Structures are given as structure tokens and as C-alpha cells.
A protein has these predicted regions:
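Conserved ATP-binding subdomain of kinase catalytic cores across diverse folds
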Residues: 2-136
Length: 136
């Protein structure tokens, strides 16, 4: 990935400059912070039977790969990889920067609102079919 295209921390911080509180979601392998119109995802330094995120370099590689793969279907959603650094010395932590969408655009919210979902599901199915038709 071209590092010149990556968002800088000053660019990512601008999106949080409005003082919006962060909403944090945690899984066994990562943490996602929702701030303003951005979502920031970091990989935890964990090792399991199926993955190894134990080093910053490994987490960097995984983040770059995730962005590259997911930009194929969601180029406007996956914005790049930035880096967080703390007050202590040490390597900066890679963070995936994504566009945050309103909760009202989640399929769960659409279903719960009673809005018909057939068109949404058809659009998803069509996009997936086109994607897989072009796969090698």
C-alpha cells in the first residue's frame, strides 16, 4: 500500500475535533472506536490457534491487508491505515481508519424499523455476484 495515501494522525484527529465522545466496541481480537464520522479499528496484541497479532509489524501487515481486501467491495468505507502513538517510547500502533455510517443504515435497524429490506438484500446479492464473477 502506498504510505503517502494513508491518513495522517492530524487528518484523523480532525474528524474527532468536534468533541464527539468515542463509542468503544471490543472483540477478542480488536477494539473499534466510533468517533464522529470515523471508525478506528486496532488489532489487539494476541495470539490464538488461528492468528498471530503479537508484534506491531504483524498487526501492521494484517491492517494493510484488511484495508486492501475490503476496499475492493467498499472503497468509500475503508480509508486507509494510520498510526497511533502514545506518550511512551515504542513503535506506533497501526489503526484501520474507516468511514462511520449512521446506525440507521445498519440492516438490523432497517429491519426493526419495519422498512422493506428486499431491495437492500437484492443490491447486496447483486454486488456479491458481480464481485465473485470477476474473481480469479
Amino acid at each position: 500500500m502506498d504510505t503517502s495515501a494513508r491518513p495522517t494522525m492530524s487528518q484523523t484527529a480532525e474528524s474527532a475535533a468536534d468533541g464527539a465522545a468515542a463509542e468503544i466496541h471490543e472483540t477478542h481480537t480488536g477494539i473499534v472506536a466510533l468517533v464522529g464520522d470515523r471508525a478506528y479499528k486496532v488489532k489487539k496484541p494476541v495470539t490464538t490457534d488461528f492468528l498471530d497479532f503479537s508484534s506491531v509489524d504483524q498487526r501492521e501487515q494484517v491492517c494493510v491487508r484488511e484495508v486492501r481486501l475490503n476496499q475492493r467491495l467498499a472503497p468509500d468505507s475503508y480509508l486507509g491505515v494510520a498510526h497511533f502513538s502514545g506518550p511512551q517510547d515504542g513503535p506506533a500502533e497501526p489503526v484501520i481508519v474507516m468511514r462511520r455510517y449512521p446506525d440507521s443504515r445498519r440492516l438490523t435497524s432497517i429491519v426493526l424499523s419495519g422498512e422493506p429490506v428486499l431491495e437492500h438484500l437484492s443490491a447486496i446479492a447483486d454486488a456479491m455476484a458481480r464481485f465473485h464473477a470477476g474473481a480469479e
